[in-house]
């Protein structure tokens, strides 16, 4: 009941205070759910600066929202609040549309934690504009070069493999390959959250990446998603280290190094593989990884001498000297 009254209060206050942009903010987007993991996500690309903060909204265990065209950002937080209060995506959409005097220029996609979808394209949305819903997803687009964009996005999402982030990227790429925004491209964003809330939002946000200004934003977004995958593995390795599970830590770190080139982490990934191998008493095996880190930045050699104070390398001056010597080979 508390959530319901909160949602109604936000609804009455938020829409009354809305100031909408005079130009359309977003062009094409997708909201979706992974039925296997419960993950929820939204991805968008636009010929508009820094599209992510206004368009993409998602909350673990609740749903995801994309609000675009002549955007009213209130659809994001209010839509999530209504779904959290027990409304389906369609019920949340209907409640918001019914109170919006500017609904004819809105375009909104929503999905709830059960995979129910809702989408709305206003009658005055700039063509080509349209949308398509499918099982566990909705795609929506406006200001398109061709009227085939949303069908291309839907087909790409339905036919692609991989996790939710990958499928969202594939949908964006399909839209761009179909011609995309008639104005061009400038920014993109992806937000993927876990299916169940942990109580720690920074843990629940699996991917939260934004390209504010770039000549090929979707391509850059894909690069950052892959880089984030590597850092997720680095984080996993760190967790294993804290549990003194060195073999599992090494495995996670090595997987991180396989996902991206060393230069993309500035040597971070191979360096920590090396450190963990030393902790696991695999000294000789650590040397190639230390060398890889040093090739990216010579500062890694200085860090070797600082780690023993944090308990991350043995207090063994002879060993530390040997590692640094091997790094520089």
Predicted segments, located by residue:
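TPR/TPR-like alpha-solenoid helical repeat scaffolds
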Residues: 267-272, 299-327
């Amino acid at each position: 009941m508390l959530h319901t009254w909160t949602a109604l209060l936000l609804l009455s206050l938020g829409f009354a205070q809305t100031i909408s942009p005079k130009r359309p903010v977003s062009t094409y987007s997708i909201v979706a759910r992974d039925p296997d993991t419960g993950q929820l996500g939204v991805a968008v690309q636009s010929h508009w600066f820094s599209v992510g903060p206004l368009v993409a909204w998602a909350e673990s265990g609740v749903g995801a929202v994309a609000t675009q065209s002549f955007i009213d950002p209130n659809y994001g937080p209010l839509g999530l609040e209504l779904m959290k209060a027990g409304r389906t995506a369609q019920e949340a959409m209907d409640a918001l549309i019914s109170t919006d005097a500017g609904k004819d220029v809105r375009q909104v996609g929503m999905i709830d934690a059960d995979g129910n979808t809702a989408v709305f394209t206003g009658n005055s949305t700039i063509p080509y504009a349209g949308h398509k819903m499918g099982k566990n997803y909705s795609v929506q687009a406006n200001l398109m070069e061709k009227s085939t964009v949303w069908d291309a996005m839907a087909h790409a999402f339905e036919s692609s493999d991989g996790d939710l982030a990958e499928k969202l990227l594939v949908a964006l790429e399909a839209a761009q390959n179909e011609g995309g925004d008639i104005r061009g491209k400038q920014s993109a964003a992806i937000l993927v959250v876990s299916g169940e809330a942990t109580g720690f939002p920074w843990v629940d946000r699996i991917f939260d990446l934004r390209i504010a200004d770039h000549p090929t934003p979707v391509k850059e977004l894909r690069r950052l998603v892959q880089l984030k995958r590597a850092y997720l593995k680095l984080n996993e390795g760190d967790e294993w280290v804290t549990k003194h599970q060195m073999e599992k830590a090494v495995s996670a770190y090595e997987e991180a190094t396989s996902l991206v080139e060393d230069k993309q982490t500035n040597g971070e990934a191979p360096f920590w593989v090396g450190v963990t191998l030393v902790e696991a008493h695999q000294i000789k095996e650590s040397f190639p990884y230390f060398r890889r880190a040093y090739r990216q930045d010579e500062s890694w050699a200085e860090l070797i001498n600082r780690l023993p104070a944090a308990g991350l390398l043995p207090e063994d001056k002879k060993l530390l000297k040997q590692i640094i010597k091997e790094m520089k080979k």
